[in-house]
Regions:
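Outer-membrane beta-barrel biogenesis signature
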Residues: 1-7
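Outer-membrane beta-barrel porins/channels
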Residues: 8, 16-20, 24-167
Length: 167
């Protein structure tokens, strides 16, 4: 756990790409011992897909295809994590993390959310036992949608076409 960092200050950075570079994952963290029994950490995570083609305006009102009307957007999740761990005695350590989450789907929608994790570790001789609770509150998100009338009309047309196809 966090109480076992072996230096007074630790910094971690990571970048990974998935699906031939389409999706990108970035992570950064800084951890610091507060005293001999406790430590704190601040972390940042971003997972996103950039340059997604927005084809909602590809076809104009007369049914003409115009590729110049394609725009691009990003869909990404970002999380800020604040963690704290404390060694209660030589055998027992506990800790927790509070997460603030921001989600964005282009200019169409965004959300703010939060979540909590906790953990405890007990060591008995050479045996180690641990328990973890991830997303104990679930990860609560409040979404805001930013759709203009034209976008809503496109959405209804797409739903109607889908229903007609599977009648």
């Amino acid at each position: 756990g966090l109480t076992q960092i072996d230096q007074d200050l630790q910094i971690g950075l990571m970048h990974a790409e998935y699906f031939a570079g389409i999706a990108k994952y970035d992570y950064g963290s800084i951890s610091k011992n507060i005293d001999k029994n406790s430590a704190a950490s601040f972390s940042f995570i971003r997972f996103g897909v950039d340059n997604i083609p927005n084809t909602t305006e590809l076809i104009d009102a007369q049914g003409n295809v115009n590729y110049d009307r394609i725009s691009y957007f990003t869909a990404a999740d970002m999380a800020f994590l604040m963690s704290y761990g404390r060694k209660l005695n030589e055998n027992l350590s506990v800790g927790g993390t509070a997460k603030i989450i921001n989600r964005k789907a282009g200019d169409f929608a965004n959300a703010w959310g939060f979540g909590f994790d906790f953990g405890a570790k007990y060591q008995l001789d050479s045996w180690k036992f641990a328990i973890m609770g991830k997303d104990i509150t679930s990860t609560f998100n409040v979404w805001n949608y930013h759709l203009d009338d034209e976008m809503i009309n496109h959405l209804y047309q797409s739903i109607d076409l889908f229903i007609e196809q599977y009648k």
